[in-house]
Swiss-Prot record:
Cofactor: a divalent metal cation
UniProt-annotated binding residues for a divalent metal cation: H97, H107, H149, H179
EC number: 1.3.3.3
Active site: H107
Subunit structure, as described in the record: Homodimer.
Predominant subcellular localization, coarse grouping: cytoplasm
GO biological process, one term: protoporphyrinogen IX biosynthetic process
Protein name in UniProt: Oxygen-dependent coproporphyrinogen-III oxidase
Annotated spans, Important for dimerization: 244-279
Cell location: Cytoplasm
Length: 303
C-alpha cells in the first residue's frame, strides 16, 4: 500500500509547494529563491525562501522527502514498538514572517511518515499523517481570527463534523508555552498520528488542510498589509517574536525531529524570525494595543 501511496503523496506535496510560492510571489511582487539539497543518509528536498522582502521579511516554504534506517527518539517516543525500524518522512512546512507588524505570522505543515516493516518480522509498514495551520498575530483583530478559523473548519467539515473541534483543541494545547502560560497565537488546527480512517481518507483530509492555507491567510494579508506602523510597533513585534523562538527551540516536535535525525540545519531553522528580542520582566501598559494581545493568547471559540 505505502509503496504505491508514496509517489502520490510526494506529487501532491510538490504541487502544493509550487502553488503556495506562486501565490506569495504574486502577493509580494518578489521572487523566492530555490535551494535544492540532498541528504547523505537518504532523500533530500527543495527549499523556497525569501529574505528581506517588503511584504515578507522572511519566508520559507519547504518540501522534504527524507529516509533513514532507524527511527529517531522524537518519532518513536509515542510508539515504542516502532523503535529500530527504517523510515521515510515527507512534507511541506512553511513559516511566513511579514514585515508589517499588523500582518500576523503564520505556519502551515502537512506531512506523512512511514515506518517500514523489518525483514523477517511478522509486521507491516505503518503510516501516519499529520499537519495543521496556525496564526500568530502581534496586533490581533477579531475579524481575522474568525476568518482564519472558519477556513480551518470549512476544510475539515467535509471529512466529519467532529474533526474541527478536536483539531482546534489539539492546536490550542500543542502551541502552548508552558513557561509563559500563554498560547503562541490564536491557534488554528493541528493533528498527528492520523491513520485510523485508512490511507485514502487520511490522505484526503491532509490535502484539504494543505489546500486551505491560501484562502485562510491571504485575505488577512491583503486587509492589513498597508496599515501604517512605526518604531513602536516594530519593537513590539520583535519582542513577541521572541516567544516564537522559544516555542520552536523548546517544544516543537518538528524542530526536534529534524535535529535528532541529522536534518538540514539551514532548513530546520528557516522558521526562525529574522529579528527578535527579549526584555526582563516587561509588561505592556494597560489599555494599549499591545496589552490587548493578552486577551487573544488563551483558547477561545472563534466560530
Amino acid at each position: 500500500m505505502t509503496a504505491v501511496a508514496i509517489p502520490a503523496v510526494r506529487d501532491y506535496l510538490t504541487d502544493l509547494q509550487g502553488r503556495i510560492v506562486a501565490a506569495l510571489e504574486q502577493a509580494g511582487g518578489e521572487a523566492f529563491r530555490t535551494d535544492a539539497w540532498q541528504r547523505a543518509e537518504g532523500g533530500g528536498g527543495v527549499s523556497r525562501l525569501l529574505e528581506g522582502g517588503q511584504l515578507f521579511e522572511r519566508a520559507g516554504v519547504l518540501f522534504s522527502h527524507v529516509k533513514g534506517t532507524r527511527l529517531p527518539p522524537s518519532a518513536s517516543a509515542h510508539r515504542p514498538e516502532l523503535a529500530g525500524r527504517g523510515w521515510e518522512a515527507m512534507g511541506v512546512s512553511m513559516v511566513l514572517h511579514p514585515r508589517n507588524p499588523y500582518v500576523p505570522t503564520t505556519h502551515m505543515n502537512v506531512r506523512m511518515f512511514v515506518a517500514a516493516a523489518r525483514p523477517g518480522h511478522a509486521e507491516s509498514d505503518v503510516f501516519w499523517f499529520g499537519g495543521g495551520l496556525d496564526l500568530t498575530p502581534y496586533y490581533p483583530f477579531e475579524d481575522d481570527a474568525r476568518h482564519f478559523h472558519r477556513a480551518c473548519r470549512d476544510a475539515l467539515d467535509p471529512h466529519g463534523a467532529d474533526y474541527y473541534p478536536r483539531y482546534k483543541q489539539w492546536c490550542d494545547e500543542y502551541f502552548f508555552l508552558k513557561h509563559r502560560n500563554e498560547t503562541r497565537g490564536i491557534g488554528g488546527i493541528f493533528f498527528d498520528d492520523l491513520n485510523e480512517p485508512g490511507f485514502d481518507a487520511s490522505f484526503a483530509l491532509t490535502c484539504s488542510v494543505g489546500d486551505s492555507f491560501l484562502p485562510a491567510y491571504l485575505p488577512i494579508v491583503q486587509a492589513r498589509r498597508d496599515m501604517p506602523y512605526g518604531e513602536r510597533e516594530r519593537d513590539f513585534q520583535a519582542y513577541r517574536r521572541g516567544r516564537y523562538v522559544e516555542f520552536n527551540l523548546v517544544f516543537d516536535r518538528g524542530t526536534l525531529f529534524g535535529l535528532q535525525s541529522g536534518g538540514r540545519t539551514e532548513s530546520i531553522l528557516l522558521s526562525m524570525p529574522p529579528l527578535a528580542q527579549w526584555r526582563y520582566d516587561w509588561q505592556p501598559q494597560a489599555g494599549t494595543p499591545e496589552a490587548a494581545l493578552a486577551e487573544f493568547l488563551r483558547p477561545r471559540e472563534w466560530v
